């Protein structure tokens, strides 16, 4: 491990210290390493041909005009990406789905875009994790 020195303005340093405290880091170096790893992992998932894993989460209105069947159709169209799906009934109208995906990150992003773009889908979020060798 090597030691490096960086210069931060006061506001950014205060934000880093606040983040470090909220997340329970023992020191700034641990926080900066995690932030950098996250940025590098996100960058790696943008490269075409990168294989990895992802978690897609979203909320949708299950009774909204054929929405559930459209989502299922999209899932079947991209069946090779699906590892597992968790379905949770939030309340009478809304459902939360969490899909674990694996495959080419470009294909995963395309699938996520297809689901999130459906009318009635809210709070869509894709978290990508490149496969580590």
Curated annotation (Swiss-Prot):
Binds 1 nickel ion per subunit. One of its GO terms (biological process) is response to nickel cation. GO terms for molecular function: DNA-binding transcription factor activity; nickel cation binding; sequence-specific DNA binding. Keywords: DNA-binding, Metal-binding, Nickel, Repressor, Transcription, Transcription regulation. The keyword Repeat does not apply. InterPro entries: Acetolactate_synth/TF_NikR_C, ACT-like_dom_sf, Arc_rbn_hlx_hlx, CopG, CopG/NikR_regulator, Ni_resp_reg_NikR, Nickel_NikR_proteobac, Ribbon_hlx_hlx. Its cofactor is Ni(2+). Ni(2+) binds at residues 76, 87, 89, 95. Transcriptional repressor of the nikABCDE operon. Is active in the presence of excessive concentrations of intracellular nickel. Belongs to the transcriptional regulatory CopG/NikR family. Homotetramer. NCBIfam families: nikR (TIGR02793), PRK02967.1 (NF002815), PRK04460.1 (NF003381). PANTHER family: NICKEL-RESPONSIVE REGULATOR. This is Nickel-responsive regulator. It comes from Salmonella arizonae (strain ATCC BAA-731 / CDC346-86 / RSK2980).
């Amino acid at each position: 491990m090597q030691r490096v020195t960086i210069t931060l303005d006061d506001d950014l340093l205060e934000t880093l210290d606040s983040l470090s405290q909220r997340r329970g880091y023992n020191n700034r170096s641990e926080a900066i390493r995690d932030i950098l790893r996250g940025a590098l992992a996100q960058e790696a998932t943008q490269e075409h041909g990168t294989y990895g894993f992802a978690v897609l989460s979203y909320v949708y209105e299950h009774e909204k005009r054929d929405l559930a069947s459209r989502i299922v159709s999209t899932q079947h169209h991209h069946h090779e990406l699906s590892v597992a799906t968790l379905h949770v009934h939030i309340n009478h109208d809304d459902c939360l789905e969490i899909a674990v995906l694996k495959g080419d990150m470009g294909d995963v992003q395309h699938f996520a875009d297809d689901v999130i773009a459906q009318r009635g889908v809210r709070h869509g979020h894709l978290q990508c994790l490149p496969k580590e060798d």
